[in-house]
């Protein structure tokens, strides 16, 4: 799985979806996604991340689909910051 970012229509908010490894288990596996969210003040500077949470892969897929329906777009503009 890869890391990807979504940005809203106004280009003021960003969400970053990335695989979450549970290293507390003997054999680390990826069975969850970490969703980080933040604000964009200027396109030329790093977004200000407000927080993050860990969701199941199914819940993350559902949220991703809902955001796309709301008009969010996949972006790679800020990938160098994460």
Range-by-range predicted roles:
Residues 1-70, 75-82:
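Terminus-proximal functional modules
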């Amino acid at each position: 799985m890869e890391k990807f970012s979504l940005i809203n229509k106004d280009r003021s908010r960003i969400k970053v979806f990335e695989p979450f490894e549970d290293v507390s288990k003997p054999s680390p596996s990826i069975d969850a996604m970490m969703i980080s969210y933040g604000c964009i003040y200027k396109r030329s500077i790093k977004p200000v991340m407000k927080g993050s949470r860990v969701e199941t892969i199914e819940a993350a897929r559902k949220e991703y689909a809902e955001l796309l329906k709301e008009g969010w777009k996949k972006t790679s503009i800020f990938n160098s910051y994460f």
